């Protein structure tokens, strides 16, 4: 079973986040722009497939990193919503 590759530390709490267009605009590119979280998910998944026949261990590690990036994508999307922005995917 493939497991996420991540440090076992809690993510910051978002319960005190309030609407802020300025902060949302600052963070939006990290969500789904060319160098954002979505692209990281796609790149690690792509490399996972390419390494699958070469090294199962490397392939599984790459997918574990992709899973962690998916979690970041989810967290950032939730944060953007709390900041009052639509988490638009613009790859």
Model-derived features with residue positions:
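Non-heme di-metal
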Residues: 1-91
